[in-house]
Amino acid sequence: MASEQLSRRENITTERKIQNAEDSVPQRTTHFELRETHELGPNFQSLPRNENQAYLDRGARAPLSANVSESYLDRARVPLNANIPEHRVREKEDFGGVRDMGKFQMESKGGNKSLAEDRETLDTRSRMVTGTPHIKEASGKGQVVEERERARERAMEEEEKRLTMEEISKYRNQAQQSALEALSAAQEKYERAKQATNETLRNTTQAAQEKGEAAQAKDATFEKTQQGYEMTGDTVSNSARTASEKAAQAKNTTLGKTQQGYEATRDTVSNAARTAAEYATPAAEKARCVAVQAKDVTLETGKTAAEKAKCAAEIAAKVAVDLKEKATVAGWTASHYATQLTVDGTRAAANAVEGAVGYVAPKASELAAKSVETVKGLAASAGETAKEFTARKKEESWREYEAKRASQLQEGEEILPSTGGIGKVLPSGERTQAQGTNLQEKVQGKGSDILGAVTETVSDIGSSMIKPIDNANTKVKEHGGTTITPKGQDAGGVLDAIGETIAEIAHTTKVIVVGEDDEVEKSMQKNIGSDSHSLDRAKHEGYRAPKNNVS
């Protein structure tokens, strides 16, 4: 700490000295500049502008010489106005008057006597002032040189000041660093010395304690030995007395435990017997209940199996009946579809004939012939479409029936329902025969219905063909025209084609629905025969030609 205070005091003293020196130098420079400006200012202002500028330029370009190194005070004492031409002429003219010599006024006395002396003095002074060119240049460029010197001195002063401040800061930092290092070293040294002292003190204390403990251990050993001898004697006597007491207590305890064990064993046996009896009675009851429940379950299971078999048989019978009905419905649908197409074709032919009647007479025969061909084509197309549709529906119905039959029937036997409520097992042969008989009976019944419907359709077709032609003839007669009657084969060609088509449709429907059967075949032929007779009768009645074609 003392070293830091000393270094701070030295730094403060040095800084004060430097500041005083820096303050004194500018003051002196400013004093000389003011004096020179006051003395040389009027002379420079009296010069013409061109000469003054040329003089300053020449002084700025001229190199420094040895005479420039003289002081500012010596240059200030030289009267510069003596070099001006106007002043020289005025001095030559007025030798006897008062003249300015520098800063003093001089008065010449004696007139011509002193003329030579005055002129000689003036020449000498002129030579001194205007003697050599470098004096004039030095006197003219004094201000420029002064400014340069002043700037140079200022720069040097600033540089010295900057260097001085940097050195001061550097020395200060070094001193602080050295002080910190010395302080750290002293602190470390103190810590090491303190640690060594503490360790030595601890070792000494530990050694003293060990010596004291050894002495105490020796005394304690002696005391313990004495106490052990005394305690051994007391312990032996106490042990003998305690052993006798423990033996007496053990005897009493053994007797008590034996009595308690006997009583506990007797109670346990009686409780176990009573618990076994109590447990056996509910167990027997539970076993009896379980047996009864098992018996009931067995009976219920048998009854349930019989009922399930009965239900399965009923379901199978219902499915078979449904399939048969579906097959019959498919036959009905095909017959209805074929009949509808035939009726539509017949109506179209009748409409064509009716339109042809209303046309002019020369075209009547041609239109009738074309209508016959058109009706034949429509009838044939209707019959072919009905056959394909009926065949496809038959195959689909048969496949569905076979699939459901295979899924519902068991292998080799089937349970059929009976009036007694118990299922009856039938062999597969008898089952098939019975099903075939029932199927044949139902199909025959349905086939008769289908053929009856076909017969009615044939009658409707005949009526539909006759009515349009009668209406056409009636309209022609009302208008006073000529009725047209088909000739030869054309007269019955339309009705023949329709009759043949209907017969084929009926036969195909019968084969698809009920199969080949003699009784059904006879019934169908009978119905078709009656239909043919009725159709022929209608044809002859409707197309009976009048005696006179032209009315």
From Swiss-Prot:
Comp. bias (Basic and acidic residues): 1-20, 533-544
Tissue specificity as recorded in UniProt: Expressed in dry mature seeds.
Coiled coil: 141-211
Region called Disordered, residue ranges: 1-29, 197-265, 518-551
Low complexity: compositionally biased ranges: 206-219
Disulfide linkage: none
Chain positions with N6-biotinyllysine modification: 103
GO terms, biological process: cold acclimation
Keywords associated with the record: Biotin, Coiled coil, Germination
Induction / repression: Induced by abscisic acid.
GO cellular component, one term: cytosol
Top-level taxon: Eukaryota
Comp. bias regions, Polar residues: 223-242, 250-265
Keyword check for Cell inner membrane: no
PANTHER family (UniProt xref): LATE EMBRYOGENESIS ABUNDANT DOMAIN-CONTAINING PROTEIN / LEA DOMAIN-CONTAINING PROTEIN (PTHR47877), LATE EMBRYOGENESIS ABUNDANT DOMAIN-CONTAINING PROTEIN _ LEA DOMAIN-CONTAINING PROTEIN (PTHR47877:SF3)
Family label: Belongs to the seed biotin-containing protein SBP65 family.
Summary of the function given for this chain in its UniProt record: May serve as a biotin source for several growth-limiting enzymes that are necessary during seed development and the subsequent germination stages, and thus may play some roles in determining seed germination capacity.
The protein's name in its UniProt record: Seed biotin-containing protein SBP65
